[in-house]
Amino acid sequence: MAYISSLDILETEIAIKKVKDFFESHLSKELDLLRVSAPLFVIPESGLNDNLNGTERPVSFDTKSGERVEIVHSLAKWKRMALYRYNIENDKGIYTDMNAIRRDEDTDFIHSYYVDQWDWEKIISKEDRNEEYLKDVVRKIYSVFKKTEEYITTEYPKLTKKLPEEITFITAQELENKYPNLTPKNREHAAAKEYGAIFLMKIGGKLSSGEKHDGRAPDYDDWDLNGDIIFNYPLLGIGLELSSMGIRVDEKSLDEQLKIANCEDRRSLPYHQMILNKVLPYTIGGGIGQSRICMFFLDKLHIGEVQASIWSQEVHEICRQMNIKLL
C-alpha cells in the first residue's frame, strides 16, 4: 500500500511549529532551563567542537581576518563552558537551538547533512554524578514526550499515539547479552520493539565481546553515566533515536577515557585543562533532535518531510515513487 501522509505540506509546516513550541516550552520548565544564544562556528584550537566518533570532518572556512573556524558538530563542550561563564546556579541550566552541518553523514530516511536539535545542559553537584540521578532526569524528559504526544494527537486526531506509559532502562551490555547474534543497531531495534521506549545506558566503552556498542567522544559524556533515548517507530520498523545525553566527564573519567581512546594530546587544550583542574562545573546535558521529534509525532516516513535539506536525484526519485513530499 502506498504511503499517504496524515498531513499535507501546509498542515505539516504548521504542525512542526506546534510540536517544537510545545516541547521546547515544557522541556525548559521541567528541567529549569534558560534559553541562550549559541555559536554556529568555533575556533578549532579551543577544543570546543564535538569530535563525535572521531572520524567526521567538520566544515571549516577562513574568515576575512585570517582565522580558521569550524561549523559545530554539537555544542556539548560549549554549553559547559557557557554555564561556567554565566554563573548559573546549581540544578539550573541552559538550552539553545543548535544547527549543525555533518558533511560525512550517511543520509537516509532518518539522517540528513543538516542537524537541528535542542542542546541543553544543567549544573549538578558532585554527589549527583550517579545512575539514579541520570534516570530521574530521563524520566522528566520522557514526561515531556508524553505530554507532547497527548497535545499533538488532540490537535490532529488522525495522528497516532505510540508511547508506552513508562520508559525502560537497559545497558548496552545487557542488550548484547540479550541479543548476542544481532548487530548493535539491530539490538536497539529489537529492544525498542519489545519495550516501546528505552533509555540505552553506558555507551562508549568496550563490552564483554570486546566490541563497543557505539563510538563516543572521550571528552564529554562519562561512558558509565550516559545513554540514548530510543522509541519504537512502527512506520519504519526501527528503534528511532530521539536524544543522546549523559552526565559529563569529571577530572577522573576524562583522564581515564582520554587514555582509553588514545587522545591524550587533547589534555593541553583549554577546555580539557579546565576539567582536569576542576574549574568547570559538574554537569548533565544532551541533545534532542527536533526533526526526529517531528517525524515521530507527525507520522512521517522521511526526515526530509519535516526539514529542508539537500538530497540526491536518486532519493528524490525514490520519494516521488513512494509519494513522499520532501520540503
Swiss-Prot record:
Localisation: Cytoplasm
Coiled coil segments of this chain: none
Record's GO cellular component terms: cytosol
Pathway(s) per entry: Amino-acid biosynthesis; L-asparagine biosynthesis; L-asparagine from L-aspartate (ammonia route): step 1/1
MF terms (GO), sorted A to Z: aspartate-ammonia ligase activity; ATP binding
Pfam families given in the database record: AsnA
GO biological process assignments: asparagine biosynthetic process; L-asparagine biosynthetic process
Signal peptide interval: none
Catalysed reactions, as listed in the record: L-aspartate + NH4(+) + ATP = L-asparagine + AMP + diphosphate + H(+)
Record keywords: Amino-acid biosynthesis, Asparagine biosynthesis, ATP-binding, Cytoplasm, Ligase, Nucleotide-binding
EC number, UniProt record: 6.3.1.1
Main location: cytoplasm
PANTHER family listed in its UniProt record: ASPARTATE--AMMONIA LIGASE
Family: Belongs to the class-II aminoacyl-tRNA synthetase family. AsnA subfamily.
UniProt protein name: Aspartate--ammonia ligase
The organism of origin for this protein: Fusobacterium nucleatum subsp. nucleatum (strain ATCC 25586 / DSM 15643 / BCRC 10681 / CIP 101130 / JCM 8532 / KCTC 2640 / LMG 13131 / VPI 4355)
Gene: asnA
